[in-house]
């Protein structure tokens, strides 16, 4: 039997991709194609993304179950997944919409994360699963479709797998803000905050990695106080680049949001009591 969860919060492709396609040369992450070529590229990319989503869900559901929810014959789904054929754009839209009703991404994440001891959140089952990361990255791509993103910025170290999956999906470079300097790099952008023990925590990004013309998506796996996120914002602002937004895999509490002056999408929100 198919488990169908509510997935109404995810924006439908018809509401995202068609407007993006019309003005694609102005909106897609850093690509400078002629408008006609860009339209075809974006449409094809979406059709291929639907196939990838089918492949990911095939690990959890049978062809019979996928056929039941999408209305596509099992034999055709099999050919999509094996790469023999690809769906038309309209068919891809219908499949995407149907699959969104099939799985609640928040429920999937909650099933894999663990709360250990006094509020410690273990995401190891998520960040070590490349299929799960790819599925979440596609969700993030849909959230930010229509916004220009040229770089993904993430603080080291735990959020790197999550940020890598997102950068690959957006097809843009990944910039890592590290806690230590590389002796081979001379110029850095720095950002600091005061830690829980009154120690100063500093992040470093090579200056050449973020330019003024960039539009940056900030990514992190867990946010508790918002201090690291605010530091990432400062780093981008120091080079006068544009912040496209921020996406957080797990947010604990909501008080920290009051001090963040950029759009933030939190995929899974946990209660303040976990701090």
Indicate where each model-derived feature is located.
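Active-site/ligand-binding-proximal alpha/beta "capping" segment
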Residues: 218-238
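Short glycine-rich phosphate-binding loop at a beta-alpha junction
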Residues: 149-156
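PRPP-dependent phosphoribosyltransferase catalytic core
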Residues: 27-43, 47, 234-275
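Short alpha-helical "recognition helix" segments of helix-turn-helix
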Residues: 62-70, 77
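Active-site-facing substrate-recognition patch
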Residues: 37-57, 65, 81-148
